């Protein structure tokens, strides 16, 4: 029989909220008897936006803004039905994007 695996990818702009959420997921999975691999930090995605400072002239005067997206990966090996139920009931902050693959 093939081993089951749940792969959870977390994304957030604030790395502190992301680390707290990933720790909650790992603690919940371990409490229900599943084997957990992670959280594994993935490369941070950095979007840079460059805009002109003035509305009309002075092309040389520009301002740059950046938006960083932090990511984590958690693998739950050999999940039990109790693990899946506990993860569905878990309450996480609003700033964290969760992607789950079975």
UniProtKB/Swiss-Prot annotation:
Keyword Transport: no
SMART domains named among the record's database cross-references: Ribosomal_S10
Matching Pfam families: Ribosomal_S10
Gene Ontology terms: biological process: translation
Record NCBIfam families: PRK00596.1, rpsJ_bact
Function according to Swiss-Prot or TrEMBL: Involved in the binding of tRNA to the ribosomes.
Family to which this protein belongs: Belongs to the universal ribosomal protein uS10 family.
Self-association and partners: Part of the 30S ribosomal subunit.
Name of the molecule in the record: Small ribosomal subunit protein uS10
Organism: Moorella thermoacetica (strain ATCC 39073 / JCM 9320)
Gene responsible for this protein: rpsJ
């Amino acid at each position: 029989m093939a081993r089951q695996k749940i792969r959870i990818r977390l994304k957030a702009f604030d790395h502190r909220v992301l680390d707290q959420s990933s720790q909650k997921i790992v603690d919940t999975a371990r409490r229900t008897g599943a084997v957990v691999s992670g959280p594994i930090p993935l490369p941070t995605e950095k979007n840079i936006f460059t805009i002109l400072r003035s509305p009309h002239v002075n092309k040389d005067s520009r301002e740059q803004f950046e938006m960083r997206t932090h990511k984590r990966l958690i693998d739950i090996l050999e999940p039990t039905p109790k693990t899946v139920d506990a993860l569905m009931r878990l309450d996480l902050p609003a700033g964290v994007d969760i992607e789950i693959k079975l």
